[in-house]
């Protein structure tokens, strides 16, 4: 899977078939993200998500058995909630990354514009995600990417604006 950031309303998530090292990738299909500037992909067994930087959204798609992408199932849009210190870079929500913990019990999304990480959990019908809580980090830090250690006990955040690596315990 790859994002296709054309800079128009046609920004998309594309599916490709891989048939071996000596064969070219075959494009299966592409589906509009409903969000601008998709920049990150996270996949579970039958769902795939894009983090869309411009406009601050996450798009959720269902996957077909053949690996193709079905029409966007849900777009979660986030708003600027406060006054971020960097008026140029933090004028709106900017989702950079969506990922999950070691067990895929929760997803996490990094928002550069709001200086926070959203914790997302399955909704009541288990057919999508909803925000469970929000962890705010230092104002002006600009969260970019989050990853977990191999055992899922610790999370590490890279910030874009302050250039830091932050560590968190995860239970």
Question: Over which residues does each language-model region extend?
Answer:
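Loop-centered beta-sheet repeat module
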Residues: 106-163
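Beta-propeller fold detector
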Residues: 24-32, 69-82, 129-136
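Short loop/turn segments immediately following beta-strands, especially the blade-tip
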Residues: 16-23, 61-70, 120-128, 168-171
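A generic, well-ordered mixed alpha/beta core segment in the N-terminal half of proteins
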Residues: 27-75
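Blade-loop segments of beta-propeller domains
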Residues: 1-46
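Conserved beta-strand positions in repeat-built beta-propeller and related beta-rich domains
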Residues: 2-7, 50-53, 101, 109-112, ...
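Beta-rich, blade/repeat-based domains predominating
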Residues: 33-47, 79-105, 137-154
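Structural signal for beta-propeller blades
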Residues: 9-13, 56-59, 115-117, 163-165
């Amino acid at each position: 899977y790859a994002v296709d950031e054309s800079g128009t309303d046609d920004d998309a998530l594309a599916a490709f078939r891989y048939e071996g090292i000596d064969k070219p990738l075959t494009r299966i299909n592409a589906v509009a993200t409903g969000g601008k500037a998709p920049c990150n992909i996270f996949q579970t067994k039958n769902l795939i998500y894009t983090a869309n930087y411009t406009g601050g959204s996450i798009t959720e798609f269902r996957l077909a058995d053949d690996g193709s992408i079905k029409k966007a199932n849900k777009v979660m849009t986030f708003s600027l909630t406060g006054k971020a210190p960097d008026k140029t870079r933090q004028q709106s929500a900017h989702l950079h990354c969506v990922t999950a913990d070691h067990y895929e019990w929760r997803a996490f999304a990094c928002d550069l514009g709001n200086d926070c990480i959203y914790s997302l959990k399955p909704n009541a019908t288990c057919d999508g995600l909803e925000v469970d809580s929000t962890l705010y980090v230092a104002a002006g830090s600009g969260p970019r990417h989050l990853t977990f250690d191999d055992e899922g006990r610790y999370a590490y955040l890279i910030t874009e604006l302050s250039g830091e690596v932050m560590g968190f315990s995860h239970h």
